[in-house]
Regions:
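Short, charged beta-turn/beta-strand-edge "cap" motif at the junction between a beta-strand
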Residues: 1-3
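Divalent cation-coordinating acidic motifs and surrounding scaffolds
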Residues: 7-170
Length: 170
C-alpha cells in the first residue's frame, strides 16, 4: 500500500478472460475566445527532470507525453493549475527546492508540441522535505499561464513563511 494504491499479489497460477480496457485521455470541446478564458488542472505525478534519481521522466518521455496532452487534449488552456511538480533534482537529497528547471522543461516541451510558450509561477516558498509527497522531492503546486492571454500581478503571491506550518505526510 502506498499513496492510496493497493496491490494484489497472486500466489498461484490462474487464468482469466479479462479483456484489457483501451482507456484514452479525454479531449475537451471547450474553446477559448477573446471574451472566454480557459482554465485546466493537471496532476503531474511527481514530475522532475532528474533521470538519475530513480524515475526517468525525461528518458521515458513523460514531459513530451504531458505536453502532447496539454496541446491536443486540453487544447492549450489560458491557465493551468499544476499539482505534484517536484523540485529540479527530484528525490535526490541535495537541498534543492526550486522547480524552475522542471517547469521550464515542461514549458519548452509544450511549445515544441505546438502550444504557446507559457510563463510559470513556481511556489518558491517550499522548505526542503517539509511538505509531504516523495521524501525530499519537495512537491508543490504551480501555474502555467499564456502571457498572450493573461498576466500575473507582481507581489500578488502569498508566502508560507513558517515552513513548520506546512502540512506533511508524517
Amino acid at each position: 500500500y502506498g499513496f492510496g494504491n493497493f496491490e494484489i499479489l497472486v500466489t498461484e497460477d490462474f487464468t482469466s478472460n479479462i479483456t484489457p480496457a483501451n482507456l484514452q485521455p479525454e479531449t475537451t470541446t471547450i474553446e477559448g475566445s477573446a471574451d472566454k478564458l480557459t482554465v485546466a488542472s493537471y496532476n503531474l505525478l511527481n514530475l522532475d527532470p532528474n533521470d538519475a534519481d530513480g524515475d526517468e521522466d525525461v528518458a521515458n518521455g513523460r514531459f513530451d507525453a504531458i505536453a502532447s496532452q496539454i496541446v491536443n487534449n486540453l487544447k492549450t488552456p489560458d491557465i493551468i493549475g499544476l499539482q505534484e511538480i517536484q523540485d529540479n533534482s527530484g528525490s535526490a537529497d541535495d537541498g534543492v527546492t526550486s522547480a524552475d528547471e522542471t517547469l521550464q522543461q515542461l514549458v519548452e516541451a509544450i511549445a515544441a508540441a505546438g502550444g504557446p510558450t507559457y510563463s510559470f509561477i513556481d511556489n518558491t516558498f517550499i522548505g526542503n522535505d517539509t511538505n509531504g509527497g516523495q521524501p525530499v522531492g519537495n512537491i508543490r503546486t504551480a501555474f502555467l499561464y499564456n502571457p498572450e492571454r493573461v498576466g500575473f500581478v507582481d507581489g500578488s503571491r502569498t508566502a508560507i513563511t513558517n515552513v513548520s506550518a506546512q502540512q506533511t505526510d508524517s
